[in-house]
Amino acid sequence: MKTAIILSLLSFLLHIHTNAQNTIKGRVTDKVTRQPLESATVTLQQRGDGNIINYTLTDADGRFQLSSSSLKDRTITVFYMGYRKKTIPVLISRPLTIELEQEAVLLKEVQIRPGRVWGRQDTLKYDLTRFTSSKDRNVSDVLKKLPGINVEENGTIKYNGKVISNLYVEGMDVSGGRYNQINNNLKADAVQAAEVIEGHQPIKSLRGKTFTDDVALNLKLKPEVRSQWIYTVMAGGGYGEKALYDASFNVLQLSRNRQTVYTYKANNIGRNLFSDQQKLASGNSFDRVTDSNPPIFLPLPEPAMPLSQKRLLFNETHTASANRLYRLDEEKQLRFQLGYIHDRTTRQYGSEEIYYFAQDTVHTATNRHDRLKTDCLNGEVNYEDNAASRYTRENFSFAGTWKSGVSDITGDNVIFQKIKNSQWELKNYFNQLYTKEKYTWGIRSYIRYTHLPALLTVIHRNLPVSSADNRLIATCIHRRDELNLPDNINENTYRTVTGQTYESIPTEYEEMNIDNAYTDNALYGMRKKNGVNYQLTGGFRGELSSVRQENSYSAPRYSFYTIPRIEWERTDFLLTAAATVWWNRLPKQSYSRFYAAPSLYFRYKFSPRWKMSLSGSLDESEGGIQDIYPFHYREDYRTVVKHTGKVAVTVRQLYTCYLEYKNTVKEFFWTLSASYSHNRYNLMAERNYKDGNFYLSSVERNHSSYSYALNTIGSKGVYDWNLKTSLELTLARNEGKQLNENIVQNYRYDYLRVEPKIVWAPSALFEVEYKATVSCGGSGIGEDTRLDPLWDVAQRLTLSLGFHDTDFRLSGEHFYNDLSKDQHLNTWLADVSLIHKSGKWRFTASAMNLFNKEQYRYTLYSAVQSYTSWVKLRPREFMVSVQYQIGRASCRER
């Protein structure tokens, strides 16, 4: 309450000192046709030095609006592709009409064709009508075809290897970063163009003042779609090992004044719906808060996914979401979001693991059957007032997650494990910023509270009993919730379920309840003069963690910090230097530390096509409560954790180099990045194995680790062939130390990954998509142990044939895996589908896993271990579905 009062008073005091701004309004049109020019770039500049004061893009009617504290010595400059640049002085504050003339380009005997990709300054535009085909189902399918853009399996969008910070539709973010709800539900042919905005600064009062490296993507809809409510219903059924279902219903309305997205989806065919509720975009960097993640002591098992999840996921999932965004006026927006997901998942897998310790090599083998249940409810309210002279953001969110995992584990012993793990969380973020001429100042506050109750139950069946007895015991425990039985199973409970008696079963319980509160509050200010931006931030961070086990334990910590920062920017280069000065205090550990964390960044543009950057930083951090918790606890059925209670300190040096080239005319994009990291630690993790358990602890011992990485991405589009190709190459090496039985071992892990992709549509009748991943990893442990490099190759080829309104699609996958130096495995998988479209109807028949492969095996290395695993695949399955979509004009738009 005190914090809220202080924030309100500061906001009020800041507000009363803000002077009125001069607003410049205008319209940009073609000089000959008088037609409005949409998305023209309009900049307000200082006469003489050319410094940008503010900038914006014109709307569909060619209109724009800019604000400035003064109109003295200001000019307006307008850029638009295919037109001459025009600069006019700003004399009085009145509506402007700016007419642009088309550029006449005379080229002898050269045929000029409009391109699919073009750009000016920091905005790159893709004409999606040149990329979309009748075989594309949604926007995500089209984005995969764009040169320079990559869409990962979970829907994450990257431009030149960088994750986008925001995805907009008509300049508005209705999903709040959960953009799969847009890309997976919006029709492919509904979008006119996609705009990539580099150096994206959504806060108007900071444009032209401070540097940002964010990249945003804006989707421009076709005019007839903006005024529509789009309803889509899909229902499908089929059969595999059991009856299958797949259903969805979504409603979209994406106008420029308000936007709505309602969705409901359900399936048990292996389609992961969690990504629809996942925030894939982090938002603008100025509003980004560094938060220490809530501590989780008893995590649920999360096995690796070596294949696409549709091959491995045995699920029953239902999800629903509602998103509503209102544009209150030109500067204010209000957004509501609510989502819920219910999921039941089963997994069957096993692993043979080898741990290479200093004095011994440990072999373990397990087979598991996991049953996971998840319920998650989340909501968010976001208000923004984004004007040229001020910026206000108030964001409140909540999330509740209830998880329960039951595992039947066989190997050397028969073990039953159950973990209940919940998380309830409240967050509030507030930012108030003001700008007056060259000065900017504001306040920022973030508060989070998290409650995490968790319970682990492990039942060991080490006694020589029959498999029938084991099945009865498992039945007893598995039906506990169904029969409303207590967690502590006794003989009477067992007799209730099975009608029999049994000996005392060795049972272990671990119950931990964690409360974690975190806050970060700061005052900041900046001044830009002669192209140099001087910034100063000062703030306070605090965290209180409380753990209730057999004993109660709390660990408060707090920090005071100040960040002086300088940005020196010219037309071709940018230099930033900062030094975060910290004073950290952990009173319970009697720990205090004062240190500085400097950083340096340099960027140079050789030309509009070439640019490079260099960076270096030194940082220091302390471990979380998991590292200083002084009591032992069982993390799972075979892992026991016990730390010393000492504060873990990590000092990190990071150096990066980045080179980029892009040629929009030739549709060619290329990046090269290299990094080197050196970490120094005061504590070393020790892992020992005894009596079927791994014991994890930490001891005071200084040591270091190193990592090197090289990554390059090339993407090329060919207009005449309707072709996109891309290639990504990654090389990495990690070096460090491990501790076992008080003996230190060095280790080194090397990794290579090559990922080519091809999308080719030579005609409307035929389309080919090819993707491959070639990877190789090898380890060296100690002086004598060398793990032979193993190759893994995954290839997928998809062929699509179209005949009028019918498409036939065949997809084949081949996996080559080295299981050892002398043993390898080939796996073939195939799917087929037939799609018929008739008006607003879409009919689909499909068959998955045609060869009915039951299992997939693979071998992987980590730094100090190797494991050969198997996982159960979804069987051969057949599905039919029907989809119907209609669009209805909005009453307000008509």
Task: Briefly describe each language-model feature range.
Residues 21, 61-63, 84-94, 115-406, ...:
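Membrane-proximal, glycine/serine-rich, low-complexity loop/turn segments characteristic
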Residues 46-51, 73-88:
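A short, solvent-exposed loop/turn motif at the edges and junctions
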Residues 518-520, 551-555, 559-561, 648, ...:
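Outer membrane beta-barrel strand-and-loop segments of large Gram-negative receptors
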